[in-house]
C-alpha cells in the first residue's frame, strides 16, 4: 500500500535545508544524508548525495528517471558474496 496522496511525499526537513543551502552557495559537493526514506523530488535532479548504506556511504547522482523513488533504493546495504565456483565443495 502506498502513501496517501493527501499527505504528499516524505522528504526530511534537514535534507531540504542542506539542499537549499547548497543551491544558494553554488557549491557542488555531495550532500551527506542518513535519510534513506526521503523521496526524490524534481528539485534533486543534478545533485549528488552520499546515502548511508550501513557501514559506509554510497554515492548517488540523481537523474530524471529517479524522481519518485526513495534515496535508499540506490544505496545497497548488502554485499553478495558469490556462491561456490570451480574448486569449491
Swiss-Prot record:
| UniProt key word rRNA-binding | yes
Q: Which HAMAP family match?
A: Ribosomal_uS19
Protein role: Protein S19 forms a complex with S13 that binds strongly to the 16S ribosomal RNA.
- State the similarity comment: Belongs to the universal ribosomal protein uS19 family.
InterPro entries annotated for this entry?
Ribosomal_uS19 (IPR002222), Ribosomal_uS19_bac-type (IPR005732), Ribosomal_uS19_SF (IPR023575)
Identification of the protein by name: Small ribosomal subunit protein uS19
Q: What is the superkingdom listed in this entry's lineage?
A: Bacteria
Q: Does the keyword Endoplasmic reticulum apply?
A: no
Which cellular component appears as one GO term in the record?
cytoplasm
The record's gene field reads rpsS
Amino acid at each position: 500500500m502506498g502513501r496517501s496522496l493527501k499527505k504528499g511525499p516524505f522528504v526530511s526537513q534537514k535534507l531540504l535545508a542542506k539542499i537549499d543551502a547548497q543551491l544558494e552557495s553554488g557549491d557542488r559537493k555531495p550532500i551527506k544524508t542518513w535519510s534513506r526514506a526521503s523521496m526524490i523530488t524534481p528539485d534533486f535532479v543534478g545533485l549528488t548525495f552520499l546515502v548511508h548504506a550501513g557501514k559506509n556511504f554510497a554515492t548517488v547522482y540523481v537523474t530524471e528517471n529517479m524522481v519518485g523513488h526513495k534515496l535508499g533504493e540506490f544505496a545497497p546495504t548488502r554485499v553478495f558474496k558469490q556462491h561456490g565456483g570451480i574448486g569449491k565443495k
